[in-house]
Amino acid sequence: MSQYWSAVVHGLTPYVPGEQPKLANLVKLNTNEHPYGPSPRALAAIRAEASDALRLYPDPHADRLKAAIATRFGVEPREVFVGNGSDEVLAHAFMALLKHERPLRFPDISYSFYPVYCGLYGIAFETVPLDDDFAIRPDDYLPHGSVAAGGIIFPNPNAPTGRLMPLSDIERIVAGNPQCVVVIDEAYVDFGGESAIPLVRHHPNLLVVQTLSKSRSLAGLRVGFAVGNPDLIEALDRVKDSFNSYPLDRLAIAGGVAAIEDEEHFQRTRMAVIATRERLSADLASLGFDVLPSAANFVFTRHPHRDAGELAAQLRRRAIIVRHFRQPRIEQFLRITVGTDEQCAALVEALRDILR
């Protein structure tokens, strides 16, 4: 710690991202990256943009990208906000829409960046326990008596559990909380869920956030977006323009547009991930693992007779990395990214050997 740090920095507990080790022949199944490459059209667009034009600032509004997203999801460009990955979009949403006198509510087991944002921006919050099956209970997010939330946020599918909430339950939560903004974090929705974006037209308090990092294979490019009522988008723009007027560079805009427009590549690769996930879930179950139903590009699993931390360590010794969370209620679970068929087969074979 430094004497020059502000009081806010002294009190922060920063988010810890999944590690990115540089090891040869590594089977990397710890950070939910797409096992297949980006759209060839996106790569071509990025290469074409890598020209003398890089001496010029990018479009501060990223209008081409907003238009592509709007067309893809059947909304208006003025209902779209874009940012440097969905983490930045979420950060702006916390500051612009979720900081109020009443506390923000989100699940106790969820994306661990949420409490970090609250600490950074001084947002009061309360966590709501998942049920015994690690599902979000919609009734827990409805006002009870005079107690109403200052905001609500949760991923759908949830992370790290992979559990999916039906769209009907999401709409019930949004409709039941007209006093606040409800943010649905849909980083993994393309792997088995139904997006809440169509509900935006009917609910001015709903903001839906997505990313191109997962289903569009562009984690290294950092492109995220939100869809919501123009009033919510204006609030996000105000925060963005008070922080960084040029969050997306020329390469990100060009690659993002092409990735959004390449529907064939998107559908083919996401369906491949879904098929592999189902095989992996069945293979893990055959080894005695308890596997939660997943609508994401990962599985959340535990073995009833083996310590999760020790399993992760033994896999690592075999050059296979998975994610282990040292957190109450889930310390005996592993989150395993769905890789290629070959990577998942190597994982299953390693676990079979460990369990002998």
Curated annotation (Swiss-Prot):
Domain of life: Bacteria
Record PTM N6-(pyridoxal phosphate)lysine, positions in chain: 214
Record bears the keyword Amino-acid biosynthesis: yes
Any one GO molecular-function label of the UniProt entry: pyridoxal phosphate binding
Keyword set, alphabetical order: Amino-acid biosynthesis, Aminotransferase, Histidine biosynthesis, Pyridoxal phosphate, Transferase
Catalytically driven reaction(s): L-histidinol phosphate + 2-oxoglutarate = 3-(imidazol-4-yl)-2-oxopropyl phosphate + L-glutamate
Key word Transferase present: yes
PROSITE patterns xrefs: AA_TRANSFER_CLASS_2 (PS00599)
Names of the cofactor(s): pyridoxal 5'-phosphate
EC annotation from Swiss-Prot or TrEMBL: 2.6.1.9
Subunit structure: Homodimer.
Designated name of the protein: Histidinol-phosphate aminotransferase
Record lineage: Bacteria, Pseudomonadati, Pseudomonadota, Betaproteobacteria, Rhodocyclales
Gene label: hisC
